[in-house]
Amino acid sequence: MHPAFSSLRFWTLLLPGCAFLFYMTPLLLRTVGIRAFTMASDSYVSGSLSAAYVTCPNDTVAKDIARGLVERKLAACVNVIPQITSIYEWKGKLEEDTEVLLMIKTRSSKVSALTEYVRSVHPYEVCEVISLPIEQGNPPYLKWVGDIVPE
């Protein structure tokens, strides 16, 4: 064996590099593969769309907000889900209310504008507006959401 291969310095330099490649190669290949597939097939880019959730005090407020979001192209679709029960602490007191939930499909880039619109028309002092990125779903539906809500 060549003396350089038996030296401790050689192995201390080689092993961290091998470990890095061992752990990072699958991640790098996955990322490159997803990007290549997306470019080749014009398919959905994970996280480019979001589902946002807003609670409302009643059906009238919920439908008004839903219509406003769709009319302003801040959402492609809003599901109005009646009669949810919310239990939360507010100003030191445990509260329980019947509310209406909006499930909103939009572009992730529009979540800030969507939030500002909801805050401007919502009757609550502190309204709930939260969002989660959409990782995957029915490709034709996701394309439709992207087509309806402009960049």
UniProtKB/Swiss-Prot annotation:
Provide the family line.
Belongs to the CutA family.
User: Which domain of life does the UniProt lineage start with?
Assistant: Eukaryota
GO terms in the biological process aspect are: response to metal ion
Residue pairs linked by disulfide bridges in the UniProt entry: none
> Keyword Signal, does the record have it?
yes
Assembly information from the UniProt record: Homotrimer.
Spell out the protein name for this chain.
Protein CutA homolog
Single GO MF descriptor: copper ion binding
Q: Which organism is it from?
A: Xenopus laevis (African clawed frog)
Instruction: List UniProt keywords, sorted A-Z.
Output: Signal
Under the heading InterPro entries, the entry gives: Ion_tolerance_CutA, N-reg_PII-like_a/b, N-reg_PII/ATP_PRibTrfase_C
Q: Which residues form the signal peptide?
A: 1-36
Keyword DNA repair assigned to the entry: answer is no
